[in-house]
Amino acid sequence: MPARPLRIAWRSIPALLAAVLLACGDGGAPESKGKGSDGQAAIDVTTLRRGNGPEPDSLDPQRARTDSSLNVIRDLFEGLTAVGGDGKPVAAAAESWTVSADGREYRFRLREGLRWSNGDPLVAGDFVVGMRRLVDPATASQYAQILEPVVNAAAIVRGERPPSELGVVAPDARTVIVRLVNPAPYLLGLMAHPSTSPAHSPSLATHGERFAQPGRLVGNGAFVLEEWVVGSHIGVRRNPNYWNDPRTRLDRVRFFHTNDPSTEFRQYRAGQLDVTYVVPAEQFAWIQENLATELHISPQLSTYYYGFNLSRPPFKDQPGLRRALSLVIDRERLTSAVTGLGEVPAYGWVPQGVSGYTPQQFDYAPLSYDERIREARALYQAAGYSDERPLEVEIRYNTGEAHNRIAVAIAAMWKEALGVKTSLYAEEFRALLASIQARTETEIFRSSWIGDFDDAYSFAQLLQSDFGINLTGYSNPRYDALLAEAVVQADTARRRALLEEAERLMLADHPLLPIYFYVSKHLIKPHVHGWSDNVVNIQYSRSLSLGSDQ
């Protein structure tokens, strides 16, 4: 059942913001003063219980869209490469690879004796089928453009060539060749993305697009899908046919759907979870004092943002109005007093830490807040709004205390600086996705983007006109041209310059409002072993184990 929409009258927002700031002051601390985990029960060393955020939208590798979906898929499927503990690509289904002298051909050698979870032999052609399916317009994958560097991929996505002409071939059962338009320095990281997973052709032939369900899904990962209890959890069990099964320590993993961080925290303290998806802001101070050894915080290549619906008023063809709203968001105050978990104020789109790239910023980033307000008021009036005729706008976001606090705070900033009247509308995550994609009701919406691989192109691509997850509908031919040139650019310095120019251009257009850069935040029980923090925040369950407290 969808969550009841939350509507807040604009007149109450300043008072609500004050309440938010006061609540953040004491952290909403639990009464217990113990220094370690409480609620401990006997440890089941064979079953890991992971908090996993909102319920996944799909477990189909080529169709899934959300972070919570990809977390599960990484346990059910394995690509040619995987992500190592340091966030860098490592060998996975492919035991080795070679790269041509010109950087345009990668030849992957599969491990000997690979099998699907049902025992069928896994061959190189299964990777060809999976990647052809990814770019096939009939699949309607929102990640189709991720293979754009591959020969003919862009033309196939546009429907101009058949999927059979994709530059991925299997000359024999253990060799996958990926041919590129031009060198792509991030290709190995891209091959670790779940959307490039192999496809089990008999399952597709038998079940069609409904193959990714319990009792039907055949994967090649360390685990097999066992159950999906809607509104509760997804259960997976160990796959004895996985090539590295002897090193898998867990028999089962349960991924619990956790929409609200505070609820998830209560489950963790009660001993119902071993790992949390996030950490609640209102209890953060208490957690730092009492659960410091269980708290993991690490930089992450991810951006929290508000998107504008550019297909309809009031933001269609109104870059000045969009800029005005961005100018008056006090990101420093927001991250220190409202979120308070170490997030970094975002004055650009690409986070710090991306390899071989200098993140760009809004041109107003050096200005004082008072200077920003003066410019914003002039832009607001130029767009036709005033105290007598205020902008009335709605922010949509998925349910959760943290998202609500942020929306309340931003609405208060807009009201105080410009007189904007804002209504807030909270809905269940999948309902929010549907609202955004329909583009008939949303005006401003909350979203986030996690880099699929350690390269600025992973962020730049999201704003490309025809990219499947371009939620704002942003379309600038110059921006698209810069990205198209970057894709085929062999000179790394020139490629970097093109991507940096593209980011500056996009920021000037203001199709979205970057608010902060994430840090990954997890609570992890002392009896969980093998966890490695990294900038892409990827942890495979096969690398984890349970035992006595560390």
Question: Predicted segment positions?
Answer:
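Extracytoplasmic/peripheral linker and loop segments enriched in polar/acidic and small residues
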Residues: A41, V168-V169, T335, D370, ...
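Ligand/substrate-recognition segments at binding pockets and active sites
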Residues: G28, V230, I373, R377-G451, ...
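Long beta-strand-rich cores associated with HINT superfamily self-processing modules
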Residues: H522-Q550
